[in-house]
Every structure is written in structure tokens, then in C-alpha cells.
Amino acid sequence: MSRLAKRHPDLLSCNFNQDYSCIAVGHKKGYTILNCDPFGKVHSNNDQGATGIVEMLFCTSLVALVGAAENQPSNSPRKLQIVNTKRQSTICELIFPTSVLAVKMNRKRLIVVLENEIYIYDISTMKLLHTIETGPNPNAVCALSSSSERSYLAYPSPVPSASSTPLSSSAIPAPPPAPTTGDVLLFDTISLTALNVIQAHKTPIAALALNSTGTMLATASDKGTVVRVFSVPDAKKLWQFRRGSSSARIFSINFNLMSTLLAVSSDTSTIHIYRLASSRKGGKDADDASTEEARSPTPSETPLASSPPLAAGKLDSHSAASSLRRRSYHLGKSFVGGVGGYLPKSVSEMWEPQRDFAFIKLRGNHGRTVVAMSATVPQVMVISSEGLFQAYNIDLENGGECSLMKEFALLGSEDFGNGSNGI
């Protein structure tokens, strides 16, 4: 999740790129791209205006931007811009019916998340391939694998309405209800087919993460006491980790690039790092009283597999939006509505959840945090809504508490808006 609590008066968003080598920062004057190691500014644009979302495509010059000015059409939160920072040119612009809450990219697909819909594009042509109606997802909870071969999308599964009526071609169906259980839907963005429904938790999903190869999915619920890791796409539970005994709001989950460690940040002062040991060991459900089940759809329950791709174009057409809603509604109604008939693939396990391998104690009022692990040095990196970048050394043999080694400001004085004195 890239949007941060606005502790720093000028910081609007902040996130790592797919391999955690760079940081993309959105602020009131525009956006900035920073290198992690060595830390430093790579590119900035202070003429863009307030920018609420900045997403990079690895270390390329392709960047996705979403504005944060409701009263300025040129910088609207409904407008997505794809820009080339090297050429300083705009590749394309798309207007959406509601505010864009998140953008995800890999080398094959671009994903745009609205509160009730997810749009899937071919990133090479910006052709709209498919739209999924998700039901209310105001926190834009989703994850896209950075792998081109396993380009999987995970998002909270909508709960089917008990009073659902057959879909009429003459009317736009009501949106599916908001997710009230901890089911996760796994979707293949290449074949445009639903792969699995995972009963990950019994309370709503708060955070999701896919590893770099698209073979593991980490999940956390809004209870925030347990983090689980499942294999993808067969959805077998591999690990279960204890974050704490008290509830917490999970801010971020990230695997390292080797998929040997998993880092989790929350609204507590502790960041947890878990070791994904070779002995893949599940755990007794700490926030669930029943067995988790991984469920696979039958061919008759995956209508998207036979649906032809949708045409590209601007999305401000009422008729086009109506068509997208009618087509994508089948995912929530037919596929998710039939999960009760799927066979369970796993049984309850008897081990207690594993504790963390290493941890970071944050000082002071840290606000919202995003955590990631360096691919080049044994360090855990933390960016915060205070406008700080911090790097902590981690002992990969013994674990324990990580030590702070570096700290830098994400915004320079030239990035500050009027009346701001910085950090």
C-alpha cells in the first residue's frame, strides 16, 4: 500500500519499486525517485503538482502517476498518467470513473485498483484486457507478482449476496458486498482466469504480498495477530507466524528477493522479520477456530476463461463502464458464489505459530511504515510517513534485534510546499 498517513506535511505517498532498489515518493509539488544504496536522488519533478501515487517499473524510466488534487482536472485522483522520466514525456493518460487507489506493475501487466473494481492492462500496448468487480475495497488491498511468467494477482474475495438474482443484460447489477471474511482470490493476469480461493483468515484481509517469483503469498487479517504464507497457485499453507497477542493494524508485508525472509510492519513500534525455513511448518489457527481450506474452481465456475478480451480506450464512457461491470460481475457471482461446493485440500495442524527471527524497535512516533529488505546487503529498509528512510543491519545467522545504520530524509528542501519547514 503506497499511501501513507500524512505525518510529514508535504509527503503524500511513498513506496519501494519491485526489487526494492528504489523509492518512489509523491508530494505536494510533484514526485521524486530515490536510489536506496547508495541513498540519493535519481529524478524529481516539482512541476507535476500534488501527486498521490507514484509507481515505478523496476528501475526503468516508466513511471505511473496519479494526482491528488480533487479540484484540478489536470491533477485529478481519477487520472492515471504513464510517463517516461528520461524523455520527460507522457506516454498515455486514462480517466477512471472513481479515484484510483493503487497501481501495480510488472513487465507484462499494469493493474489499476479502484474502490470497487480492478482494471488489467497489457503494459506494452496499454490495451484494457479485463475488469474485475471486487466489491468495496477502500484500502486497495491487493498484490501483484513482479514475475512475468507467474503474473498472479491476489485480492480479498467478495462475499456473494444471499439474495443475488440472475444477471440481467438490461440493467447494471448492484456491486457485490464488501468482504467480511478472510478469503483471498488468486487470479492469473496472463490467461485472465481465476485460479484459487484461499480461506486465509476468518476476519477481513488487511495486507497481501506475493514473492518475486509468484510462488508464495503472505496474508494478514485486520486482527493482525497472525501472518500466514501459502504456496501459489495450489494454496497450501506453508508457514504461520505469530506477530503478537494483541490486535494491530498491518501496514506492509514484503518478502526478500530470495524468499527466505518475510518482513511485517504495523501500527506497533516493532517490525518483525520471519525466517522462511526449509521445514515448512504450519501452525494451529490463532485467530481461526476452524480448518482453512484451499479451493480450486471447476471449469464451469470460471466464466472469465472463455471471455474475449475487452477493447482499450478511455474509461469515461457510460456504456463502456456498464459493459465492464456486467462482464466482470460473473467473477464475484458465479466463481466466488460457488466456493461452498469446493473440496478442502488441507486439514488443521497442531503446531503453534512460529515467532519472529529478527525484529526492529522503532523509536518515537513513527507513523505509517513500509518495510523491505535489500537485495545487495544484509539490511532491512524502512520508509515512514515521517518522511524518513532508515536502514538496519540484520544478523542473518542469529537474528535478534536489528541495529540502525543509516537515516535520511525522503524530501529535500526543494520539495517542500509553501509554509513547510521540512522534517
Swiss-Prot record:
Quaternary structure note: Component of the PI(3,5)P2 regulatory complex.
Membership in a protein family: Belongs to the WD repeat PROPPIN family.
Cell compartments where the protein resides: Preautophagosomal structure membrane; Vacuole membrane; Endosome membrane
Alphabetical UniProt keywords: Autophagy, Endosome, Membrane, Protein transport, Repeat, Transport, Vacuole, WD repeat
Sequence motif L/FRRG motif, residues: 241-245
Protein name: Autophagy-related protein 18
First-listed, main subcellular location of the protein, grouped into a coarse class: membrane
Matching SUPFAM superfamilies: WD40 repeat-like
Signal peptide residue numbers: none
Region (Disordered): 281-317
Extent of Basic and acidic residues compositional bias: 282-295
Physiological role: The PI(3,5)P2 regulatory complex regulates both the synthesis and turnover of phosphatidylinositol 3,5-bisphosphate (PtdIns(3,5)P2). Necessary for proper vacuole morphology. Plays an important role in osmotically-induced vacuole fragmentation. Required for cytoplasm to vacuole transport (Cvt) vesicle formation, pexophagy and starvation-induced autophagy. Involved in correct ATG9 trafficking to the pre-autophagosomal structure. Might also be involved in premeiotic DNA replication.
UniProt KW Protein transport keyword: yes
GO terms for cellular component: cytosol; endosome membrane; fungal-type vacuole membrane; phagophore assembly site membrane
Pfam hit, one: PROPPIN
GO molecular function annotation: phosphatidylinositol-3,5-bisphosphate binding; phosphatidylinositol-3-phosphate binding; protein-macromolecule adaptor activity
Free-text note on domains in this protein's UniProt record: The N-terminus might form a beta-propeller domain involved in specific binding to phosphatidylinositol 3,5-bisphosphate (PIP2), leading to the association of the protein to the membrane.
Gene3D superfamilies (UniProt xref): YVTN repeat-like/Quinoprotein amine dehydrogenase
Gene Ontology BP annotations: autophagy of mitochondrion; glycophagy; nucleophagy; pexophagy; protein localization to phagophore assembly site; protein transport
Gene name of the encoded protein: ATG18
Swiss-Prot/TrEMBL WD repeat ranges: 200-240, 245-284
InterPro entries according to UniProt: PROPPIN, WD40/YVTN_repeat-like_dom_sf, WD40_repeat_dom_sf, WD40_rpt
Membrane topology listed for this record: Peripheral membrane protein
